[in-house]
């Protein structure tokens, strides 16, 4: 799959932040936070009795918003297996708003994704899908989920719900297997993968260390719970000058040779490495 290299899905997804759909007046603050992804929240952050109003407020606000293309504005709908999730989907499809992406929570099977893909296709919308992996059932079929639709641009790790589902404490070590499986599935599908937010707002150093662990594991970015976390996340997930220089060298050498593999600085470099280097350079170009 060459989606990272040739597709429109190559973009910076180093950080994301939620903003409540019930309060459109808060959207500008989230958009100005510096996060690469701004997610309008209709699910867990909205009380049941406010769901309808939040949906209506969000659609009305989206019809008026003018956005910088560098910001990926998405909407997290309610679980697609619930009444409010179905109402969310129907409202957005019938509104004609071509969202950059819809975030799908609590996905459990590829069939859910395929159904939503069909709905968006029938409505002639280009909307991508961000899929949250937060249940053990999803882990069991995660490779099929990740490949179930070309609309999927990213997987998100829902660590809080996953820990509850697995009956374990929400710690890095306890959830390492789940994180690793999600990273592998995303890599196999050629899509981005983002880690769960760090929940201790006052422990910036702890967040930084967990973000570094996530980056080293293969995550593209990490969520936030407050704008003050964004700067650090963007720094961690932005390729360093050394990484950029190395990536440029590999891409240039492949372009010159036209071969499928090369030896550069004594190391064998194959096409999968080239794709990752191209991804890094594309991200740097996007955030300049």
Task: Report the location of each language-model feature.
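Expand to "…catalyze enediolate/carbanion chemistry for C-C bond making/breaking, isomerization
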Residues: 1-288
């Amino acid at each position: 799959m060459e989606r990272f290299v040739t597709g429109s899905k190559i973009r910076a997804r180093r950080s994301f932040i939620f903003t409540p759909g019930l309060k459109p007046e808060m959207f500008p603050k989230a958009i100005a936070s510096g996060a690469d992804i701004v997610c309008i929240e209709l699910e867990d952050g909205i009380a049941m009795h406010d769901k309808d109003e939040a949906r209506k407020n969000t659609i009305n606000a989206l019809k008026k918003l003018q956005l910088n293309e560098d910001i990926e504005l998405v909407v997290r709908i309610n679980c697609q297996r619930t009444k409010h999730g179905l109402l969310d989907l129907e409202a957005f499809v019938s509104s004609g708003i071509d969202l950059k992406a819809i975030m799908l929570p609590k996905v459990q099977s590829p069939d859910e994704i395929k159904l939503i893909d069909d709905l968006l296709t029938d409505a002639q919308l280009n909307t991508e899908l961000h899929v949250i992996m937060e249940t053990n059932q999803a882990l069991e079929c995660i490779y099929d989920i990740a490949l179930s639709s070309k609309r999927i641009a990213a997987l998100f790790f829902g660590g809080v719900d996953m820990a509850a589902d697995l009956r374990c404490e929400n710690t890095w070590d306890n959830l390492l297997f789940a994180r690793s499986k999600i990273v592998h599935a995303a890599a196999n599908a050629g899509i981005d993968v983002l880690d769960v937010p760090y929940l201790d707002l006052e422990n910036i150093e702890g967040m930084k260390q967990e973000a570094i662990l996530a980056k080293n594991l293969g995550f593209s970015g990490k969520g936030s719970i407050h704008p003050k976390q964004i700067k650090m996340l963007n720094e961690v997930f932005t390729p360093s000058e050394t990484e950029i220089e190395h990536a440029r060298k590999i891409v240039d050498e492949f372009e010159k040779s036209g071969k499928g593999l090369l030896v550069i600085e004594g190391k064998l470099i194959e096409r999968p490495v080239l794709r990752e280097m191209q991804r890094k350079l594309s991200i740097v170009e996007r955030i300049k």
